[in-house]
Amino acid sequence: MSRLRTSHALRTAAALVAVGCLASGCSSIERLSQIGEQPKLTAIDNPTTKAGYKPVSMPMPTPQPASYNPNSLWRNGSRAFFKDQRAHQVGDILTVIVNITDKANIANETQRSRANTEDSSITNFFGIKKVPGTNGAGNMLTTGSVASSDGKGSVVRQEALQTNVAAVVTQLLPNGNLVVEGKQEIRVNFEMRELVVAGIVRPEDIQSDNTIDSSKIAQARIAYGGRGQITDVQQPRYGQQVMDILLPF
């Protein structure tokens, strides 16, 4: 009897583990296989070969034929006497200076009130001069309503991020603008910090030292986060996240 109970308990535990794995996804299985190990660095790969990659398509001006001066020592876009050292073609590297200091303070207040009263009277209701239970057929309907609304809201946010990251030119648009993407991973003990920068850069905004400020990147996508033990502790459990979405209260 004890063996049957033990086997039944083991089957129940296995079923619960399977249900938990299905509820939390395949990521839980991967995390279980990495218990006691540091987060692994992702392999360096070509961003254009990733699943879901789509080349950037933007409105372009009409192409203009290039003009050449045969007796000139300079060429268009040159910033040095011999050669322009800035990134200008696919595969080149430039440094993105990420300097974000955002501060927002928003306050809203709304007040509404409305009062409504309606009286309806009938002098003759199908020849009936007096309705049973009333003094007459006059005031048949009287309605009144009062509504009021008072709402207040405020948002206070302050963010700061200062760092540098090298980005690679992944695409050259027909008008000369560059599509750049950079990723940086820093592992400290059992926590991995990730920084991703992507966007469209105008070659004229690249400084002589081959750097560009993040504020001059169009369609900028900047993400800074992490993964590891500290991030796992800060995130609520999968079951709690599901209950937060489903419970209406």
From Swiss-Prot:
Chief place of localization: membrane
| Membrane-topology annotation of the record | Lipid-anchor
* Protein's GO biological process: bacterial-type flagellum-dependent cell motility
**Lipid-attached positions, S-diacylglycerol cysteine:** 26
Instruction: Mention any Pfam family matching this sequence.
Output: FlgH
Alphabetically sorted, this entry's keywords are: Bacterial flagellum, Cell outer membrane, Lipoprotein, Membrane, Palmitate, Signal
Location in the cell? Cell outer membrane; Bacterial flagellum basal body
Citing just one GO molecular function, the answer is: cytoskeletal motor activity
Which positions carry the signal peptide feature in this UniProt record? 1-25
Q: Cite the positions of N-palmitoyl cysteine lipidation.
A: 26
In terms of PANTHER family, this protein maps to: FLAGELLAR L-RING PROTEIN
Q: How does it assemble?
A: The basal body constitutes a major portion of the flagellar organelle and consists of four rings (L,P,S, and M) mounted on a central rod.
UniProt xrefs under NCBIfam families: PRK00249.1-5
Q: Which HAMAP family does the UniProt record give?
A: FlgH
Function, as annotated: Assembles around the rod to form the L-ring and probably protects the motor/basal body from shearing forces during rotation.
Family, per entry: Belongs to the FlgH family.
What name does the UniProt record give this protein? Flagellar L-ring protein
Q: Which organism is it from?
A: Afipia carboxidovorans (strain ATCC 49405 / DSM 1227 / KCTC 32145 / OM5)
- Upper taxonomic classification of the species? Bacteria, Pseudomonadati, Pseudomonadota, Alphaproteobacteria, Hyphomicrobiales
